[in-house]
A protein has these predicted regions:
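Conserved beta-strand hairpin/beta-sheet module of binuclear metal-dependent hydrolase folds
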Residues: 25-69, 155-169
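Metallo-beta-lactamase
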Residues: 22-24, 28-30, 52-53, 60, 109-153, 160-161, ...
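Positively charged n-region of N-terminal signal peptides that target proteins for export
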Residues: 1-5
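Accessory terminal helices/loops
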Residues: 203-209, 217-292
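Bacterial N-terminal signal peptides
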Residues: 7-17
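Active-site metal-binding motif and surrounding structural segment of the metallo-beta-lactamase
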Residues: 51, 62-106
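Divalent metal-coordination and catalytic microenvironments
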Residues: 33, 47, 57, 71, ...
Length: 292
């Protein structure tokens, strides 16, 4: 009951946030202790308590300095923890923005390989494998890893008090859709469906109703029912690739002959294009044939 009441309260706040914007950088104070910030179409979150602030994905050096300036000018505690949601450099390249050696930087274990050679990335001080609970100043944040999905080490972040998820990629708050990058260099077909199944299990167990993504959109939050809808999309891609192989409509370069495919099931999804569908099916057939 407590979680349900907080969810209603949170949704009311999400539609009336206090906003601050400058130089392409903007901040939405969703509540007293939850802040959403964005820069150039990417967004992330800042969790503030009486003792310190916890930053998820500082994005880049400019954004990190803007966040530090916001905290200072609003008499809010400085950052004690930084959480990397995954290893992609466009979300974590802070440069020299953080000089405080006491900041704990947390990442999933598989991220280490991708972070070791980039001097613009503040190196993690703590790695975890499957689950980590962070409790600071009475705030609890749970980190979950469900295997490779969007890259090798993307995690799910659960804000326990708000009962809200931060899902950095693979989902959109408006609903299931084609991905923004159809070349899918990051996609891991071998474990993607299991990732969604595990995420659905978490949502059901914790009775989580809403999520925020790592990309700006018309809606700040989305319903967690979208998780199952997006899983169905990827299952469709997988079964299409498998059936196309059986039907012999995939050529030697792993391109599908769309003229021999009923396109209606795919056209219902937002951001559909035939070129993107070809690329996605090619990604799956490449995996089926070569394991890559």
């Amino acid at each position: 009951m407590k979680n349900s009441l907080w969810t209603v309260f949170l949704f009311a706040l999400l539609f009336t946030p206090a906003s601050i914007a400058s130089d392409g950088f903007s901040i939405k104070e969703v509540s007293e202790d939850l802040i959403v910030f964005n820069q150039g179409g990417k967004q992330s979150i800042l969790i503030v308590n009486e003792e310190s602030s916890i930053l998820v994905d500082p994005l880049n050096e400019h954004t990190a300095k803007q966040i530090q300036g916001f905290l200072t000018s609003n008499s809010k505690p400085m950052i004690s923890h930084i959480i990397y949601s995954h290893s992609h450099w466009d979300r974590i390249s802070t440069g020299t923005a953080f000089l405080n050696k006491d900041v704990e930087v947390i990442a999933q274990q598989a991220c280490g390989l991708y972070l070791s050679s980039n001097q613009a990335v503040l190196k993690p001080t703590k790695y975890f494998q499957n689950y980590l609970e962070i409790t600071v100043g009475g705030k609890t944040i749970d980190l979950y890893y469900y295997g490779p999905s969007h890259g090798e080490c993307m995690i799910i972040i659960h804000l326990v008090k708000e009962n809200l998820l931060f899902i950095p990629d693979l989902l959109h708050t408006k609903g299931a859709r084609f991905p923004m990058d159809p070349t899918l260099p990051y996609l891991r077909p071998a474990t993607l469906i299991n990732f969604f199944i595990e995420l659905e299990t978490l949502v059901e167990k914790k009775e989580i109703k809403s999520f925020i993504t790592g990309h700006t959109g018309i809606k700040l939050t989305g319903s967690t029912s979208i998780i199952a809808e997006q899983r169905v999309f990827w299952e469709l891609m997988q079964t299409t690739a498998e059936q196309a192989e059986e039907d012999g409509i995939i050529n030697l370069d792993n391109f599908i002959d769309l003229e021999k495919l009923d396109l209606e099931p795919y056209q219902q999804y937002e951001n559909y294009s035939s070129e993107d569908l070809i690329n996605i099916i090619r990604r799956y057939t490449s995996f089926q044939n070569m394991g890559r």
